[in-house]
């Protein structure tokens, strides 16, 4: 069994994990029945883990979202699809490995699946550029989404990036233009689009594949205009104030659901998705199937209208009205 990577606030579980591993080794090396002791320790560890994860701060949720063993885009795709075919290239000489996409089927419905892909170790992260896509990655994604729109395939996107790559080469190749073009084009696609934030949803890098009819988000994922570290450095000239920035930025699923930015918060297993990836995959698949079933019943015109209205109300100053009241007011004005 691979060794689990424990976060700072999970340190109270270290001793329990050691005891559980020792008992498992004893069971392997002898015929002694230790099932009862093992069950008691695992139950205790699960209970303590639930207590810890019930009261996570926004800064701690960021640590969970960045966990190196958290399920990635490819992990979820492999759970969903037996017929996944990856498509490569932006048709302009590049094939960014930080943003992947391809064809598959979910519950017998052909779909396009795409998303950011991080690595599991240093070597993989270098290949994947730590999940930070370059302009070619967003142009590849756009090419695949245009293909999906042409052949009436729903689009499923998975967001997990600290942000778009901000190096000099990316700026020279038109990073801002590539993301802006994706935003514009995604508003016009006449197929259902479901986006899920499975880890980090960082800035424009997340938005580049995040214009969707339904925006889902895991319980311990984060969605932010800038990383708390960057925000703290800009506002207070002190990166140590990142925890305060994380709270002020409203980056958690609970906050974003209240603000009307996302449509559903998906629950995670005790300890986060990295503790039970199959359970996380089943949760995500069930939610996607439910939302996709609803969206497929809508006409192309209804999809476009709903998508436009959804984003039109974001960022509007709210003094006393609820998000629902503003949406209703906006719809009435259009009529």
From Swiss-Prot:
CoA carboxyltransferase C-terminal domain boundaries: 40-294
Catalytic activity: N(6)-carboxybiotinyl-L-lysyl-[protein] + acetyl-CoA = N(6)-biotinyl-L-lysyl-[protein] + malonyl-CoA
Subcellular location: Cytoplasm
InterPro entries according to UniProt: Acetyl_CoA_COase_a_su (IPR001095), ClpP/crotonase-like_dom_sf (IPR029045), COA_CT_C (IPR011763)
Pathway: Lipid metabolism; malonyl-CoA biosynthesis; malonyl-CoA from acetyl-CoA: step 1/1
Example of a GO cellular component annotation carried by this entry: acetyl-CoA carboxylase complex
Swiss-Prot/TrEMBL keywords: ATP-binding, Cytoplasm, Fatty acid biosynthesis, Fatty acid metabolism, Lipid biosynthesis, Lipid metabolism, Nucleotide-binding, Transferase
SUPFAM superfamilies documented for this protein: ClpP/crotonase (SSF52096)
Main location: cytoplasm
GO biological process: fatty acid biosynthetic process; malonyl-CoA biosynthetic process
EC numbers for this chain: 2.1.3.15
GO MF term set: acetyl-CoA carboxylase activity; ATP binding; carboxyl- or carbamoyltransferase activity
Quaternary state and interactors: Acetyl-CoA carboxylase is a heterohexamer composed of biotin carboxyl carrier protein (AccB), biotin carboxylase (AccC) and two subunits each of ACCase subunit alpha (AccA) and ACCase subunit beta (AccD).
Family membership: Belongs to the AccA family.
HAMAP family named among the record's database cross-references: AcetylCoA_CT_alpha
Function statement: Component of the acetyl coenzyme A carboxylase (ACC) complex. First, biotin carboxylase catalyzes the carboxylation of biotin on its carrier protein (BCCP) and then the CO(2) group is transferred by the carboxyltransferase to acetyl-CoA to form malonyl-CoA.
UniProt name for this protein: Acetyl-coenzyme A carboxylase carboxyl transferase subunit alpha
Organism: Prochlorococcus marinus (strain MIT 9515)
């Amino acid at each position: 069994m691979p060794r689990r990577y424990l976060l700072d606030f999970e340190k109270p579980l270290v001793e329990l994990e050691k005891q559980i591993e020792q008992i498992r080794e004893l069971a392997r090396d002898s015929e002694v029945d230790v099932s009862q002791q093992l069950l008691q320790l695992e139950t205790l560890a699960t209970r303590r883990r639930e207590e810890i994860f019930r009261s996570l701060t926004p800064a701690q949720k960021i640590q969970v979202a960045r966990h190196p063993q958290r399920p990635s885009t490819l992990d979820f795709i492999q759970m969903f699809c037996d017929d996944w075919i990856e498509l490569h290239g932006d048709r302009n000489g590049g094939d960014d490995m930080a943003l992947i996409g391809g064809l598959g089927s979910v519950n017998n419905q052909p779909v396009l699946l795409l998303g950011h892909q991080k690595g599991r170790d240093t070597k993989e992260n270098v290949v994947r550029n730590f999940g930070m896509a370059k302009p070619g990655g967003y142009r590849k994604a756009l090419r695949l989404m245009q293909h999906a729109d042409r052949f009436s395939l729903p689009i499923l996107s998975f967001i997990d990036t600290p942000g778009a790559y901000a190096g000099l080469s990316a700026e020279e190749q038109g990073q801002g233009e590539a993301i802006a073009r994706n935003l514009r084009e995604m508003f016009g696609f006449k197929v259902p689009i479901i986006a899920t934030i499975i880890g980090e949803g960082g800035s424009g890098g997340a938005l580049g594949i995040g214009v969707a009819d339904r925006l889902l988000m895991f319980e311990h994922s984060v969605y932010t205009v800038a990383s708390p570290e960057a925000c703290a450095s800009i506002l207070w000239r002190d990166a140590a104030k990142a925890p305060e920035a994380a709270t002020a930025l409203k980056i958690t699923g609970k906050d974003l659901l209240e603000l009307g930015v996302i449509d559903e918060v998906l629950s995670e297993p005790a300890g986060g998705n990295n503790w039970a990836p199959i359970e996380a995959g089943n949760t995500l698949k069930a939610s996607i199937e439910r939302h996709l079933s609803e969206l497929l019943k809508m006409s192309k015109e209804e999809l476009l209208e709903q998508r436009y209205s959804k984003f039109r109300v974001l960022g509007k100053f709210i003094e006393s009205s609820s998000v629902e009241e503003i949406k209703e007011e906006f719809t009435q004005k259009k009529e």
